[in-house]
Amino acid sequence: TLYSILFYCIPKGSRDMREELNVEELFASKVFTLGKMKERLPKSTYKEVKKIMDQGGELSLATADVVASAMKDWAIENGATHYTHWFQPLTGITAEKHDAFVTHPDEDGRMIMEFSGKELIKGEPDASSFPSGGLRATFEARGYTTWDITSPAFIKETATGPTLCIPTAFCSYKGEALDKKTPLLRSMEALSKQAIRIVRLFGNTEATKVLPSVGAEQEYFLV
């Protein structure tokens, strides 16, 4: 019989992380998943958000306020005091514009933490700081970030502390794509629209959306 023996060393004063790390609890613990939305949002609000995720459409400002409040409470519970619209400009790296939940003290001098649906849905970073791929004149500075409801918000932990990161698309005032995500989202929408036509030819009348998957290699065969 062949035996193998594993030796490992734990520095004095250190903890054995194997005993303390619970992968099931750690996985997505810093992500505002659908499960967390379902727990924290009213049933009607959750249904509206889920419908827009699946079928597209615009989120009402009233619903966005409810989602923003729940997202803020969750972020604060995880130690965040700031939020950022997180996007991918044409620089090859991500960009962030940080804002605080802290607004102003109340009459009793207590700190008020606020986050509105308007702040969740839309931001306005200085687009002149980022390349546009020649789409517009260099002096045009206006740019907008818009919440991508299909991508979950998450907590990013750095040396300065946790921050709520809200995945967004980055566009110009005229709707020109200034990032790498907007063309991807538009391509997915166009592909879904045409794929549904094919699905209908095969007799499926219930499907409303087709989701592409991206990998190192993807193939399909039509028989």
Language-model-derived ranges and their functions:
Residues 1-16:
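Short, Lys/Arg-enriched N-terminal segments with co-localized hydrophobic residues
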Residues 5, 23-29, 56, 149-152:
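Short, mixed-charge, low-aromatic patches
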Residues 10, 78-79, 215:
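Generic structural microfeature
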Residues 16-19, 83:
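Positively charged, low-complexity intrinsically disordered regions
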Residues 18-31, 35-41, 201, 207-223:
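Active-site-facing alpha/beta catalytic cores
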Residues 22-26, 44-49, 169-173, 193-194:
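Short amphipathic alpha-helical segments, especially helix-boundary/capping motifs
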Residues 25-140:
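Active-site core of metal-dependent hydrolases
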Residues 141-223:
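Glycine-rich, acidic/polar active-site loops that bind/position phosphate-bearing ligands
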